[in-house]
Structure formats: C-alpha cells, structure tokens
Amino acid sequence: MKNHFYGLYLGLLILSNLVSSFNSFSQVTAKKCLIVSDIHFDPLFGSHSDTVLRRKLERSSFDEWKKIFESSTAQMTINAGLLFQDANYGVLKSALDNMKVKLPHPAFIIIAGDYIWHRATPADSVLKRKCLQFIALLFKEHFADTPIIPAMGNNDTYGADYILQDRKFFNDFADAWAPNLPKSSGDQLKKQGYYSYETGNLKLMVMNSALLSFGSHYPQAPAMFSWLQTNLSDDKTKNVWIVMHIPPGANVYNGSNFWNVDYTQTFINSVVKYSSKIKLSIASHTHFNDFRVFYDAANDPVAYMRIVPSISSSHGNNPSFEVAEFNSVTCRVIKETNYYLDLAALPKDKGVTHALWETTISLPIGLKLSEISAGDFSKFMDNLKADQSWQLLNDYKKFYTVGTKIDSSIRTNKVNYLKYLKADSLKEK
C-alpha cells in the first residue's frame, strides 16, 4: 500500500512539474507589442486661423509645445465633437496614457505611418518637422526603453500629400525617433527611406509605400523590391513581419487601386513565394480594421495582412490602438486586442480630460476564427458570403468600424461590405 501511495505521489509530482514547465514555457514564448497608426496630430486644432498661435508654435522648441497645448481648451477637450476630426493633444495624450496602462512594457512598438495632420501643405514644413519631433518625444517619454519601429505615411512629407519624401525628411524622421529607433535601422532609413530591424529571431521590414502609391512612377521603387527580395531569400531570415502604410489592393471608396498595378502584383508574388517566412504584414491608411488574404496560383490562402485602425477619428471612426500577442519562437500572432475610445458615448456639449479606452474588439474571437491565419480569414469571407442571417456581416461591421455606429451608407451598406471583402483577396500570377 505504501508503495502504491508513493507511486501515486511521484506521478502527481511529475505531472505538476510538467504543467509548471509548460506554463513557464508559454510565458517565455508569448510576447506582446503595440501597433499604432494614423495619428494625424493637429497642432493647430480648432485654431487654424490663429496666426499668432502659428508663429508661436513655429518659433517655440517642440519640447515647449506641451505647455502651449495644456493651456488650450480646444487641444485638451475630449468629447463627441472630435468625431470626423484629426487628433488634438487630449486624444493623443489619452491614447498614450492608456497604452501605458494596457501594456507597460511592450516588446516593441510599431507605428504604421501618418503622424502629420490632414490638409497640411509644403508651407507648413516647420510645423510638420516639430509635429514629428513632438509625437516622438511623447512616445519616448511613455516608453523610454522600448524599441519603436515607425513607418512613413502619405501625409508624412515636406511636400504635398503623397509626394515622395526628400533626404532632409528621411534624416529628420530618423533623428526624431532615435535612440528608440536603433542606429543601424535609422542609418538605413536616412539612406533610402526604408529599413529593417531585428529582434530575437524576428526581422521587421519597413517599406515606404510612397514609392508605390497609385499614379506614382518613382525610379527608386524597383530598388526597394530588390531589397525586399534579397532579405526574404536570405537563408538566415526565418521569420518576417512586413510593415507599411498604404496597403496593396483595391480602394473601394473610389474604385481605383491603392498601388500601381504592376507593383501590387510584384509584391503579391513575393509574399506568396516566401509565405513560409512572412508571418505577418501590417498596413493602415484606411483608418478602419480590415485584412487582406494572399492566395497562390492554386487559389490556396498562404499569407495575410492586417490593416489596423487609427488614433485620428477623421473618418468618423473611434480612436484605437492595438495590443498584439505573438509567439516569439514562431513569430505568429496569437491574439489581437483593439482598445478604442467610444467618442459617441461622450457628451457633445462638454468634454473630459481623462478617458479610459476600455471597450475592446479582439481576434480571433471577434470574427469567430479558430486562429489568426490566412486560412481562417479566407474561410470567414466564404462563410460571410453564404450567410443569410447577416450575423457574420454584423460581426465584420463591428470589427471594420472599430465599434463605431456610422450612418454613412458607403460603410454600412451590405453591397459595399462585400466589395471590401472582394478587395481583401490578392492572388499570385
């Protein structure tokens, strides 16, 4: 009997150690990062006709801006009136404060472009530079020791919207994010406008989508694709995340393409060819939640891209940021959580200065996926098209709009949502 109990005790002890080891391994392999996009901070929020304020901001150092904004009611107020507007200082600060609460020590932070406010012009270059420096300062104050991986968007230029950045912008942009953007990555950015960053066994490749946007014909674009191909074909490269601002594929809002068609197909073919290495692609630009699925020539889903929502609510969307949990060994994303600020639930006639971004949308649960993968996103699209109950459409709608109740028919009409899904399919040729 003694031997029996001793054997049982020994078995339970071994089982307990195995469970403990598994839990420890899970904790070690699971890491989390922040993904942010389309901040569109407006330093002249509510005061674009105020020439005195403009001159004050232009003449002040960017690290003096905080005091200026803190004395401005327009900059500090958070309320329902911010819907369809760029971000004021109140929203930007609230976003960063909530990021720090939700994930105090991220493995890294990805920012997928568009820091500068809409309708900025080349004449605003001084404010643009200080705007970038100010945003970078705030991120570095909140996350002093965290690597920050920023991409450039179409608004991020000293020229007009969508115009390729010049060398001065590359230098200013890289310097603004140093030292959180490591020097080796910053040097690449200064030289060519795109770069890579390695952490553990993951390589992040940050493209400059200004080279690819529809109607552009920049001679530097082929060199960027060559750089991408060279890195992906390297035997030492095992796990890759690709980051950009403007996604490939169709723009359902105006019927055009986001990129030049040839560039789109070149990118699709590269992603399909190296799909075993590319564990995630990230884009933004639309201000809404979405995805793309890459299919090989046999029509099998082999890779996916996530399009992440924005801090700016200029498209009528809720301000949002994401926490992504990933396996540090395989570098595949396990879970995504969008934290958003429900602006419509706030008063219109008065504002708050502190807001909790508590409402969440998550993957894979939000779209009833079994896991976050190309195959599951593809199945979701097939199931939605066949669903007569509209339940999956409602799930997609909530996911796409980040919980915003938008009246605009271009976003809530069923036909248009099916167009979005059609645009989400990218096939090898």
Where are these regions (language model features)?
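Active-site-proximal beta-strand elements of phosphoester/diester hydrolases
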Residues: 31-43, 81, 201-212, 243, ...
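Non-catalytic terminal accessory segments
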Residues: 27-31, 104, 331-429
